[in-house]
Amino acid sequence: MSGSKSPRGEFAGRKLRLKRKWCRWHDYNYVRRVLKLKEKYDPLEGAPMARGIVIEKVGLEAKQPNSAIRKCVRVQLIKNGRVVTAFCPGNHAINFIDEHDEVIIEGIGGPKGPRAKGDIPGVKYKVIMVGRNSLRELVRGRQEKIKR
């Protein structure tokens, strides 16, 4: 008779349930969800976006085989004081962002949380708004930055 690892029979329900409960801990996504690891270690604390203050502008070198200096900014988040690096997408987008500006950042990547963008090592966030203006609209010339 071929052996089955799962108990089979009329009264095997409890054993099956306990085994399923034990085996779930080998599932990466289950562990992350139950222990709330995203909220614990994510600088955005599980939120889709966050506000922050620009500390400095930085240029990061792209990984091989590309050769470029990607324009990024260091941002201190208002909600928890953590400092993250955010990418500035678009041609000359860095020129619309000054130090001490308030920006809104969001994660780069998909549903599994922020992932590093393309050839920029360690940058998991991008700037989407500067002050009350969309960075994309500023780059396209449809809006002008409000001077205070």
From Swiss-Prot:
<keyword id="KW-0687">Ribonucleoprotein</keyword>
<dbReference type="InterPro" id="IPR012340">
    <property type="entry name" value="NA-bd_OB-fold"/>
</dbReference>
<protein>
    <recommendedName>
        <fullName>Small ribosomal subunit protein uS12</fullName>
    </recommendedName>
</protein>
<dbReference type="Pfam" id="PF00164">
    <property type="entry name" value="Ribosom_S12_S23"/>
</dbReference>
<comment type="function">
    <text>With S4 and S5 plays an important role in translational accuracy. Located at the interface of the 30S and 50S subunits.</text>
</comment>
<keyword id="KW-0699">rRNA-binding</keyword>
<keyword id="KW-0689">Ribosomal protein</keyword>
<comment type="similarity">
    <text>Belongs to the universal ribosomal protein uS12 family.</text>
</comment>
<dbReference type="GO" id="GO:0019843">
    <property type="term" value="F:rRNA binding"/>
</dbReference>
<dbReference type="InterPro" id="IPR005680">
    <property type="entry name" value="Ribosomal_uS12_euk/arc"/>
</dbReference>
<dbReference type="InterPro" id="IPR006032">
    <property type="entry name" value="Ribosomal_uS12"/>
</dbReference>
<keyword id="KW-0694">RNA-binding</keyword>
<dbReference type="InterPro" id="IPR022863">
    <property type="entry name" value="Ribosomal_uS12_arc"/>
</dbReference>
<dbReference type="GO" id="GO:0022627">
    <property type="term" value="C:cytosolic small ribosomal subunit"/>
</dbReference>
<dbReference type="GO" id="GO:0005840">
    <property type="term" value="C:ribosome"/>
</dbReference>
<dbReference type="GO" id="GO:0006412">
    <property type="term" value="P:translation"/>
</dbReference>
<comment type="subunit">
    <text>Part of the 30S ribosomal subunit.</text>
</comment>
<dbReference type="GO" id="GO:0003735">
    <property type="term" value="F:structural constituent of ribosome"/>
</dbReference>
